[in-house]
């Protein structure tokens, strides 16, 4: 099994004073839309069979071009939303023993898995190693 851990494409910055409910609807900016459009080509050789995303609009928007290109449904999962607990995200990872899946999520969630928050639009290609471990295979910088 391979996981492609995608931090959503660029979506500008959270505006001061904006609550979580409104921030969930923040769309990608122009650069983010270009990054999302490049994912089908970037991921072409991985054989992706599942697309999972945070329910936040910027995450869903990041994977929509890939979903269209691969004719795959996008599965919204609360375990990929901002503020998720470590136990929840590792339980989701444990569900994937045979799929090649994209998890589109946020910096804080990726920080729980990777120990760092990668750049927006970037991808870590990893293999779960059991016992809450990931074997890092490759880092893919954000598409230009």
Language-model-detected regions and their locations in the chain:
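Active-site-proximal alpha-helix that buttresses catalytic centers in soluble enzyme cores
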Residues: 1-79, 83-88, 116-124, 144
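Active-site-adjacent alpha-helix immediately C-terminal to a catalytic or transition-state-stabilizing loop
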Residues: 87-136
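Short, solvent-exposed aromatic-acidic interface loops
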Residues: 135-144
């Amino acid at each position: 099994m391979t996981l492609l851990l995608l931090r959503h494409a660029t979506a500008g910055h959270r505006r001061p004073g904006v609550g979580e409910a409104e921030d969930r609807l923040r769309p990608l900016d122009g650069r983010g839309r270009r990054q999302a459009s490049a994912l089908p080509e970037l991921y072409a050789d991985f054989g992706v069979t599942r697309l999972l995303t945070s329910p936040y609009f910027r995450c869903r928007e990041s994977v929509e071009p890939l979903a269209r290109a691969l004719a795959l449904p996008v599965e919204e999962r609360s375990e990929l939303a901002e503020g998720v607990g470590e136990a929840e995200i590792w339980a989701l990872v444990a569900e994937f023993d045979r799929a090649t899946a994209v998890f589109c999520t946020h910096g804080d969630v990726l920080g729980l898995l990777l120990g760092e928050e990668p750049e927006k639009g970037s991808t870590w290609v990893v293999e779960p190693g059991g016992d809450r471990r990931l074997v890092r295979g490759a880092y893919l910088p954000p598409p230009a």
